[in-house]
Every structure is written in structure tokens, then in C-alpha cells.
Curated annotation (Swiss-Prot):
Keywords: Hydrolase, Serine esterase. InterPro entries: AB_hydrolase_fold, Esterase-like, S-formylglutathione_hydrol. It comes from Escherichia coli O139:H28 (strain E24377A / ETEC). Its EC number is 3.1.2.12. This is S-formylglutathione hydrolase YeiG.
Length: 278
């Protein structure tokens, strides 16, 4: 591992690291915020997954999460949104390829060689964080848009791994919206049954009641992608039918930007703290 940057921030440290990923077959960067140490108890971790076109720095720089994370004693880990590099398959569109990994394991060429973000987030990155930093094994997950999709599927596919999950403007039903259909067709092929494994609505309908964890979703009602790409009401209905403890908040006037995330990130951190710090 190689440290790329380090900055003092709210008495803690904001760092950026590069490491060679055996899962993704390329070097990867991630950012981490380490709150000021309190006692000998290792702090819990909140993983943040960003959206299309982003990398590990968007949330770090724009969301303003460090102040409250420092107060609460929560480590923030921000991975990249895809594998990177000249040897990694890419596409000219912003919504496929590098910067658009969709947090799944691709099965189709040319993507399958590198695009295994799900395995990276489930196994390799948490193991690296555990081995290199003083953190507890308690963790939660959150994300925005494509990253909200990622956070939800990570939680739904891994019962017991996360204490809680939250999302801002998530893509909840990728099997049925243009962003998801384009990505899944390329990464997973034309068998739509294979897509269901990566769709949070389908996963929620298939979930067991004992695996449900507290879930918070914020969605701006002035989001230009709300009707065509996001459709949170579809997941809310699945949650209702499965008695999943999910709160969906529609925030008047807010759009899809980091101004929206910055406005409510404190709520999300305090939400996760209730369960991480038990």
C-alpha cells in the first residue's frame, strides 16, 4: 500500500491510498477518514459508495462528512467506483465502464477480467482496511445514485455483515431503468434472470424477515432522474410487503447533486451511529 495524500481534518486524518487489487487485477485507490482516537476501543466503519463518473474523492471533498464522523468516532472508507487503468475495458459513455462499475461482478467479455467490484467490496477492501488500520469489525454502508444501488445490494446480499444501510437517490430497480439495462446488458449479458441478483427490489422481495436491517433513503423531489432512473417508490413497496424497516424521505426542492448529500449527510451518520456504536 502506498499513501498518496494525508491531511489533518477535525482532529483526525483524511488519507488517500493506492494498493494492488488481486480481485480487480489493477491498482486501486481509496480514501479513508480516521477520526481522532478516543480510547482503546477500535472505531466502526461506514463504507460510502459514490455514483456514476465519480471516484473516491467526490464524497471526501464535497459532502462535508468529516466533522460529524469525527464527533461520533466513525471511520469513513470511500472506494473508487470501478477498476481503472489503460488495460481495463472502458466505454465512451459516462454510464458504462470506468467510473461506472455498478458494484457487481461482470460475467461478459471484455468486462469480466476486471469488473468485480462486488467481490472487492465484500472481501478484499474490508480485509485490507481491517489489517492496515485500527478499526472494529462493525460496519455500515451508504451511497449515492449508482452507489446507493451498490449499498443496498451489498446489504441485501450479505445478511449480518452491516448494522444498517442508507442511500441518497439510489437506483433501486436497475432491471427496469435505462442506466441499469445498459449496464446489466453489457456486464451480465442478455439473460435477465441473471440481472435479478443485482437488483435491490428483487433481492428485497426474496429476503428473509430475520435478515432485515434499519434502512434510510433520502430522495430529492427536484431530482432530474427521479421518474426515469430512480423510482424509490418501487423499493418502498417491496419494503412494505416484506415489513423491512425502511424510511423513505422525499426532500422538497432537492436535486441529484452533492448539495443534496451535504444537506443530509449528518442525518445519515447519526442514523448509522445508533447501530454501529451499540
Amino acid at each position: 500500500m502506498e499513501m498518496l495524500e494525508e491531511h489533518r481534518c477535525f482532529e483526525g486524518w483524511q488519507q488517500r491510498w493506492r494498493h494492488d487489487s488481486s480481485t480487480l487485477n489493477c491498482p486501486m485507490t481509496f480514501s479513508i477518514f480516521l477520526p481522532p482516537p478516543r480510547d482503546h476501543t477500535p472505531p466502526p466503519v461506514l463504507y460510502w459508495l459514490s455514483g456514476l463518473t465519480c471516484n473516491d474523492e467526490n464524497f471526501t471533498i464535497k459532502a462535508g462528512a468529516q466533522r460529524v464522523a469525527a464527533e461520533l468516532g466513525i471511520v469513513l472508507v470511500m472506494p473508487d467506483t470501478s477498476p481503472r487503468g489503460e488495460q481495463v475495458a472502458n466505454d465512451d459513455g459516462y454510464d458504462l465502464g470506468q467510473g461506472a462499475g455498478f458494484y457487481l461482478n461482470a460475467t461478459q467479455p471484455p468486462w469480466a477480467t476486471h469488473y468485480r467490484m462486488y467481490d472487492y467490496l465484500r472481501d478484499e477492501l474490508p480485509a485490507l482496511v481491517q489489517s492496515q488500520f485500527n478499526v472494529s469489525d462493525r460496519c455500515a454502508i451508504s451511497g449515492h445514485s449508482m452507489g446507493g444501488h451498490g449499498a443496498l445490494i451489498m446489504a441485501l446480499k450479505n445478511p449480518g455483515k452491516y448494522t444498517s444501510v442508507s442511500a441518497f437517490a439510489p437506483i433501486v430497480n436497475p432491471c427496469s431503468v435505462p442506466w441499469g439495462i445498459k449496464a446489466f446488458s453489457s456486464y451480465l449479458g442478455e439473460d435477465k434472470n441473471a440481472w435479478l441478483e443485482w437488483d435491490s427490489c428483487a433481492l428485497m422481495y426474496a429476503s428473509n424477515a430475520q435478515d432485515a436491517i434499519p434502512t434510510l433513503i433520502d430522495q430529492g423531489d427536484n431530482d432530474q432522474f427521479l421518474a426515469d432512473q430512480l423510482q424509490p417508490a418501487v423499493l418502498a413497496e417491496a419494503a412494505r410487503q416484506k415489513a423491512w424497516p425502511m424510511t423513505l424521505r422525499i426532500q422538497p426542492g432537492y436535486d441529484h447533486s452533492y448539495y443534496f448529500i451535504a444537506s443530509f449527510i449528518e442525518d445519515h451518520l447519526r442514523f448509522h451511529a445508533q447501530y454501529l456504536l451499540k
